[in-house]
Amino acid sequence: MGPLRLLPTAVLLLAQAAPWEASQHCGRLEYWNPDNRCCGSCLQRFGPPPCADLEFSENCGLDDAGNHVMHPFQECPPGQCNRNSAELCSLCGGGATAPIPSGSRGGTGRPCREPVPNKEPCPLTPGKSSILSSQEPSSPGIPSVSWTSEHKAPQQAWPSLSFALFLVLVLLVTSAIILLALQRHHRRLDQGKAVQHPYPSLVCSDLDTHTRFLHLSSPASLETSEARDSWKEVSLSPLLGREMPSLESQPLSRLLDELEVLEELILLLDPEPGPGGRMACGTTRHLAARYGLPAAWSTFAYSLRPSRSPLRALIEMVVAREPSASLGQLGTHLAQIGRADALQVLSKLGSSGACLA
């Protein structure tokens, strides 16, 4: 019973030690095609050796069943070289190529049955052999070099390229939606402003219109028509005419005593344009700029509302700085900022008591 127990172990050892037999049908540089039952050329299927000092393995590393049992190429034997991508190596000294065995190879041995070690710069990695085993045998007349792993690189690049294109498309669509939303929002704002002030010219009169209106009541209108752009240099008499002849000689401080007129001017000039409010051509802020006060002063004066009127503070400031300031100068500034309504209220202080039509 002892020898029988050692029989399976001996069979395994013999199977491992049994050399790989070459093709029983084809020569060394050929392989057996079991589908067509003929011998194919290793050169036509795999092409010449890709690197120097390599030659074809026996039967291209294929057995008669079409299985890849080793790599198609192997290193040259010691003392032989292959610089011209020939099928087999030759003597390094320029000798003839080693003879090529042909015909049936019934179990003949090979020069090297050990795995071929890696060699730079063209290593023969085991990963390439695993790729070879998954390929179907091709016809002898069609060369095939698809056993290299580099051919899978374009297939791996497709998913990342598709994702990048999808991301760019999403960004473009999102940007277009945002732009359309902004355009609609601006259109709605413009429509709202148009509805709120359908006739801006009626709310805020043009400066030239008031200029022509005041010039018509003056006997020297033709002479003053050439000086529309220099309001400060134009005297009060040609501008206001016979309706308010005494305003130019009255001090501005009188307005502080005429509380009724002052309150009407405050109601007209202090409010500023805003949402839902009346739009005005000129406010107390614009009037202060005509008197040469900085914008910071106007901001401070408006910050005191409603406990203190900015217009009243402006008149007190001008009277304190320039006691000789007159109502005529105030009327000129009101005409400059296009406030005919305020001019009509100011005309109540005239000796005639007439109002602008």
Curated annotation (Swiss-Prot):
This is IGF-like family receptor 1. InterPro entries: DEATH-like_dom_sf, IGFLR1. Gene3D superfamilies: Death Domain, Fas. Residues 129-139 have a biased composition (Low complexity). It comes from Bos taurus (Bovine). The gene is IGFLR1. The chain crosses the membrane at residues 161-181. Residues 1-22 form the signal peptide. The lineage of its organism: Eukaryota, Metazoa, Chordata, Craniata, Vertebrata. Probable cell membrane receptor for the IGF-like family protein IGFL. The keyword Membrane applies. Residues 100-147 are annotated as: Disordered. It is found in: Cell membrane. The keyword Membrane applies. Coiled coil: none annotated. Residues 182-357 are cytoplasmic. PANTHER family: IGF-LIKE FAMILY RECEPTOR 1. Residues 23-160 are extracellular. Keywords: Cell membrane, Membrane, Receptor, Signal, Transmembrane, Transmembrane helix. GO terms for cellular component: plasma membrane. It is a single-pass membrane protein.
